[in-house]
Amino acid sequence: MNRHLVGTAAGLTLALALTGCGKGSSSGTDDSDGRTITFVAAKYDDDTQPFWENLIDDFEARNPGYKVNLEVVDWEQMDSKVKTYIQTKQQPDVLNYNKFSDFARDDLIYKADEAVSAKVLDDFLPLFADQATYEGVQYGLPFISSARLFFYNKEIFGKAGVTAPPKSWAEVEAVARKIKKTGAIPLGLPLGPEEAQGEFGIWSMNNGGGWVDDSGKWAVDQPANVETLTYLRKLTRQGLTQPNPETTNRKDVFNQFAQGRIGMLNGAVFMRKGFIDPVDKNLDYGVAPLPSKDGTTHNTLGVQDYLVAFKKDGGKNREAVNKFLDFFYQKENASRFLSTEGFLSVTKSAGDALSSDADYYKPFVDALSGAKFAPADNPGWAAVDGAVKQQIGTAVADGDPQEVLKKIQKTAQKAG
């Protein structure tokens, strides 16, 4: 599926692209000549591994003597895998991940201008290049992006007598009560370890909260966040969400939505390609701004993943890394990855990958220009992100929202 859109908002041309990823193969150790490298890719869906295997075959055919060993890892295991790589000094040459600044702080990775050519660097859209810097220097290589909006099932809404998607939290609760009477799950709320930080971040930013204050200091336990988590706990306890949000992952509720079992949820641009179309291309659903507490200002979560290149063997791997990364970022290769998966493009050249389906992607592009991102430029984010994934859901189960957030705040302050 190849769809892409180029949208212009706030003076920025945002190129959109779809991506496809797959399963894992074995990783290998570097050859002494530096011509064999290891690439660890995150699994986005079942298309991930086939894409990378084909691209690597093509790369090796065009670059005799160079070899890329591939390992594809599920997102649920990625954090622990990366932690082990670093602790055992077995990090790959190239890693597809959602963090980078802690590696930059510890001088483990190449700067962006050391990892790719000037042509590739210039191709990154400024919005994403700016999110890939540590202390004013770009280290992360923008890989894919996504924006989050509110998905709702029109058929379920019709049965519940609801004519429009909710704009405020009060409306979310009111609509959820009506949907519950139809027998459907009112609201999908994934606070399990896959991406709890994203789900909670969506709700908190739409209540004036966030991870840091205006000065950039950690503010995980700020009043707005406590209020947000208390609200989500209320919805859970009133049976207005799926059972056990604290153990439910994003992909679980996305699948249930695709099956027509959930009335509404915070969704992602890749939902249609990765979840809805494979199950029911005729599903009647709509996309709307994310609800906010007051129903007037609607913030969007922007998500960006990166490629990072680790320094190894005194820099002996750099030439092979350069060749492989420059090969991937060629327009035809990057566009094909994006069109396989359904993500938004981070480069100018891949901006037409979604043009055949502009109507679907336009709201996401428009939202992305003003989106709020996780503080990935703060090396402490890796620790905070991990703590949120493991702990935030306990607050809607049997924990206390304020105490849970205080605990995560302590982790943040310790991380720096």
Task: Enumerate the language-model features and the residues they cover.
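Conserved N-terminal structural module of periplasmic/extracytoplasmic solute-binding proteins
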Residues: R3-D102, A164, S292-G295, K316-A320, ...
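Extracytoplasmic/periplasmic substrate-recognition and gating elements
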Residues: D57, A61, A160, T230, ...
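Extracytoplasmic "Venus flytrap"/periplasmic binding protein-like
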Residues: D58-P126, T133, G158-A160, A164-K167, ...
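Hinge/lid segment of periplasmic solute-binding proteins
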Residues: N98-L149, K167, E173, I179, ...
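Long, aromatic- and glycine/proline-rich binding clefts that accommodate carbohydrate-like moieties
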Residues: Q131, A288-P289, L338-A387
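Extracytoplasmic/periplasmic solute-binding protein
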Residues: Y139-F143, R148, A170-A219, R233, ...
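Conserved C-terminal helix/tail region of periplasmic/extracytoplasmic solute-binding proteins
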Residues: G158-K159, D366-G416
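Glycine-centered hinge/linker elements that transmit conformational signals in sensory
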Residues: A176, K217-E246
